[in-house]
A protein has these predicted regions:
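Contiguous transmembrane helix-bundle modules in multi-pass membrane proteins
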Residues: 1-2, 102-107, 111-117, 121-269, ...
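Short alpha-helical segments and helix-capping/turn motifs at coil-helix boundaries
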Residues: 74-77, 90-99, 259, 267-281, ...
Length: 463
């Protein structure tokens, strides 16, 4: 125990120290509940494509779409999927009543599933108010993410039930099982009728009827005939594969065309990536290491900077230092124009903050003026128009390293709150919270010798 505590203790302490200064030391409940799982989404455990998650977004009618009114939920539609397979559902319907006599371990898993469902439903049950105050719970931003372990645990419980059936340790009857499954299908049909979506939902419901009927038939034959284990496994695996391929097929969250992610390939031929590579490589000055930014290019683009080694100001859902968050007001994502937000201290691409951070290259999916309303003609240079969007240069971007020859006392909290920067030459002056009134030093030079993730070597001549 002592050895284990020593092994994990140090990284845990480092994590806690970082969390205190991060942009996510905790997430307030008013924001967390916006990612609750709507109770109507539980019906996808029976009919996976009930709401049209596999089709065009315009045809999706499940929560949180307009068909359910104002829900104040912010979830991707695939987050409402809780399908674990027709065979698993059939086994649960056949054996769940018998788990009152199950092993203690299996009762634990069932209790855990109940707790996770209550957590996933978020604002829709009073239980979440209590669960939120369990230590550590306020670190999680989406209750609906609990659907991942819910489906995994229910599949595990179903596997245990199938084991008990095949071992002759449980008995089941087809009629009650079929009745339970039929009742669930009726609930799905009623939901479609209520929302006037029978035309769209009828085919997914009929397909679910077919798979559930086949699952019950397969289960009955396996239990009665007791085929060889290899054949049993082959039948179960083949059926589940067919079920997930047809009943819960690829959607925009799991299987977009590979061509859409060309910019994420290390050897990408994407024109925007190619131009950025060339521009970044062309600046060989020893004091430069230009930063860049992807904005309004789409959901997937922020990750391209990681693939290609670009130094980007933004990112996708990053863990940031809270000071950087206050300085930039950067959101979790900048895939759309309105998601690229600015702050008082960093009010525009044409600003002291943009120059000081060395932000030289800006790739956007729309004209930069639609993202930054403060821009005026000539503030940025349009370098290229690519199939993806626009590439701009900020010609005023500072080098990554240089020697400041004077200091100036500054109130950083005031700069962050008001955006009022001291009127000085920032190529010569460094702002400090507690600066002394020393005479300016003679100019010097600085250059980057090496730049790695864990170590940066800078050579300076500061007379």
């Amino acid at each position: 125990v002592i050895s284990g505590a020593l092994v994990v203790g140090f990284p845990v302490l480092l994590t806690l120290a970082l969390a205190v200064d991060s942009n996510r030391p905790s997430i307030i409940m008013s924001e967390v509940v916006k990612a609750s799982l709507h109770p109507a989404s539980l019906l996808t455990a029976v009919v996976p494509d009930l709401y049209g998650v596999d089709g065009p977004l315009a045809e999706f009618w499940g929560p949180p779409s307009v068909k359910f009114g104002v829900t104040d939920l912010f979830l991707a539609r695939n987050m409402g999927e809780v399908y674990m397979g027709a065979l698993a559902l059939a086994v649960l319907g056949a054996t769940l009543y018998a788990f009152r006599r199950a092993d203690r371990d299996m009762k634990y898993f069932l209790a855990f599933v109940v707790a996770l469902v209550l957590y996933a439903l978020g604002r829709y049950t009073p239980a979440f108010t209590l669960l939120y105050y369990v230590p550590g719970a306020d670190l999680w931003r989406r209750p609906a993410d609990a659907t991942f372990p819910i489906c995994a645990l229910l599949a595990y419980v179903a596997g245990y039930g199938l084991h008990r059936l095949l071992a002759g340790e449980m008995r089941w009857r087809i009629a009650p099982t079929a009745a339970v499954l039929a009742l669930l299908l009726v609930a799905c049909w009623a939901m479609a009728e209520w929302k006037d979506q029978v035309a769209r939902a009828s085919m997914p419901i009929l397909m679910a009827c077919g798979f559930l009927a086949a699952a019950v038939t397969l289960l009955a034959w396996i239990v009665r005939s007791a085929p060889a284990p290899a054949l049993t496994m082959a039948l179960i695996g083949g059926f589940c594969a067919l079920d997930f391929a047809l009943g819960s097929g690829p959607n925009e969250s799991t299987a977009l065309p590979p061509s859409r992610f060309e910019m994420l390939r290390p050897n990408s031929t994407n024109e925007t990536i190619r131009l950025l590579r060339e521009k970044l490589a062309a600046n060989t000055a020893p004091d430069h290491r230009d930063r860049m930014e992807f904005a309004a290019l789409g959901f997937d683009w922020p990750n391209a900077s990681l693939v290609h080694g670009f130094d980007q100001n933004l990112g996708y859902n990053p863990l940031r230092l809270s000071l950087f968050q206050r300085f930039t007001n950067a959101d979790d994502l900048a895939g759309l124009p309105e998601q690229r937000r600015f702050s008082k201290a960093f009010p525009s691409y044409r600003s002291i903050a943009a120059d000081l951070t060395g932000l030289r290259w800006i790739a956007t999916g729309v004209p930069a003026e639609e993202i930054d309303r403060n821009l005026k003609p000539g503030d940025l240079n349009l370098v290229a128009r690519t199939p993806d969007g626009y590439l701009y240069e900020n010609p005023r971007a500072f080098p990554r390293v240089f020697i400041a020859t004077s200091t100036l006392r500054a109130d950083f909290d005031d700069i962050l709150a008001t955006g009022r920067w001291p009127d000085v030459d920032y190529r010569k002056t460094i702002l400090l919270a507690d600066a002394s009134d020393e005479k300016p030093r003679r100019p010097g030079t600085a250059k980057i010798v090496s730049y790695r993730n864990a170590a940066i070597d800078i050579e300076a001549d500061a007379p």
